[in-house]
Regions:
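Loop-helix junctions at membrane interfaces
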Residues: 1-206
Length: 206
């Protein structure tokens, strides 16, 4: 309990709150730069908005990563609104937390390059697994209901890109899982390349 209280106090320090706000704002802006992928429907777009989330989680802990991810979603909703009845934004937050929290938990116990790489690999794996589960049982069914779309029509959007996508399970395995694997891997790669320099700035100048 005492350790948890100290960690909460540190997280809520003025410096960390400022950094989380800055990283959340940067992450929200990065959501504007989206790249479509050829193997998934158009509402799956690749971006690098989770790089600040992952950096913040490494620097300040897993809870900070979740807060930064929430800030980016709030900024996106305020500036752009939603075209997915909030489902896309919820999915984005879940993805970010699934990647950043396991990575930060592993890195926190032994802060080394090897630990960071192991953490990011674990984070990507969790991101893929959580993405498969939530899309199968929560996100895609909710999306279909929100837009009064038969699930077959949603699956058909995947079939148009890949004839092997002929069921919800195939949609998740051949579109959702590769998308999360690609995004998580690219975000982790960029984070690995820039984290050391950014962390020095956080410690020495902010």
């Amino acid at each position: 309990m005492e350790l948890a209280a100290r960690q909460e106090k540190k997280l809520l320090s003025t410096k960390n709150m400022v950094i989380m706000a800055m990283f959340g704002a940067l992450s929200g802006l990065l959501m504007y730069f989206q790249i479509p992928v050829p193997f998934a429907p158009s509402f799956y777009k690749l971006d690098f908005c989770d790089v600040p989330v992952l950096i913040g989680a490494f620097a300040m802990g897993p809870a900070a990563g979740a807060v930064i991810a929430a800030i980016k979603i709030l900024i996106s909703l305020v500036l752009r609104g939603t075209q997915t009845a909030g489902i896309g934004e919820l999915s984005n937050w879940i993805q970010a937390c699934s990647l950043a929290i396991p990575a930060a938990l592993i890195y926190r116990h032994h802060k080394s390059k090897a630990s960071a790489i192991l953490g990011m690999a674990a984070g990507v794996a969790v991101m893929v697994l959580v993405g498969c589960f939530t899309n199968t049982y929560i996100l895609l069914p909710t999306y279909a209901r929100a837009f009064q779309m038969p699930m077959d029509a949603l699956i058909g959007m995947g079939t148009a890109l890949n004839p092997r996508i002929n069921s919800l399970a195939a949609f998740v395995l051949l579109a959702v899982a590769p998308f999360n694997l690609l995004k998580g891997s690219l975000v982790s790669l960029v984070t690995a390349l820039i984290y050391k320099r950014v962390s020095i700035v956080i410690k020495n100048r902010l």
